[in-house]
């Protein structure tokens, strides 16, 4: 194994360890989609932050601010303006930002991120039976570090999905309206809930 491959393996191992330990302390992950929310996340005691906005000109600075505040930074690459849905955008995040990992719905992006040592979260929208039927195959194929399921309020679906992802940790997100959505998702087996609903960020 080449030195860069060894470094990538170690990088992912350390990121996984931190993610699992941090979600044990703080099960709600702030997801920021503008500069105002970014500042709120920086000031919070949450240790992991999802970045859901930015473009190729601003993402480096957004990530830098969060890293300077000691945060683990996960960039949703599908939402960054100016980045095409190609492997090269993953390489850009790896080489030109300090991000720890990515979120994506796209299998090839998750695979490439694994190759370059980024922590990976594959997001699934549980909108129909076909999505549910294919989740096991997709997860086996891409091998993400974490599976994310939307929306968060479907406790029964979270339990079913956990059976399909064969031991992968699951984060719930989307339509987190109140505390019961958070506690329900966690009680169903999710290790964390990510949300843009700022009043929910302080739930422990």
Where are these regions (language model features)?
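Catalytic beta/alpha-barrel core
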Residues: 29-33, 48-56, 74-82, 98-107, ...
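Conserved N-terminal beta1-alpha1 strand-loop-helix module at the mouth
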Residues: 2-73, 81-83, 98
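Short beta-strand/loop segments at the ligand-binding rim of alpha/beta enzyme cores
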Residues: 21-28, 69-78, 98, 116-125, ...
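Glycine-rich phosphate-binding active-site loops on the catalytic face of alpha/beta enzymes
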Residues: 51-53, 151-157, 174-181, 186-204
């Amino acid at each position: 194994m080449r030195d860069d491959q060894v470094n990538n393996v170690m990088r992912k191992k350390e990121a996984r360890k931190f993610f699992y330990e941090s979600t044990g302390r703080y099960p709600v992950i702030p997801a920021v989609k503008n500069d105002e929310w970014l500042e709120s996340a920086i000031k919070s005691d949450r240790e992991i932050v999802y970045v859901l906005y930015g473009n190729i000109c601003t993402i480096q600075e957004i990530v830098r601010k969060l890293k300077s505040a000691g945060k683990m930074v996960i960039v949703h690459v599908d939402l960054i303006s100016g980045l095409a849905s190609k492997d090269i955008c993953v390489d850009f995040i790896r080489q030109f930002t300090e991000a720890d990992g990515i979120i994506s719905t796209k299998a090839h992006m998750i695979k490439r991120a694994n190759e370059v040592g980024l922590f990976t979260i594959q997001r699934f929208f549980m909108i129909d039976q076909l999505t549910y039927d294919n989740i096991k195959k997709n997860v086996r194929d891409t091998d993400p570090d974490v599976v994310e399921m939307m929306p968060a309020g479907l406790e029964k679906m979270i339990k079913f999905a956990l059976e399909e992802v064969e031991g992968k940790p699951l984060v719930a997100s989307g339509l987190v309206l109140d505390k019961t959505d958070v506690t329900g998702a966690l009680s169903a087996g999710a290790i964390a809930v990510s949300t843009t609903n700022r009043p929910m960020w302080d739930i422990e």
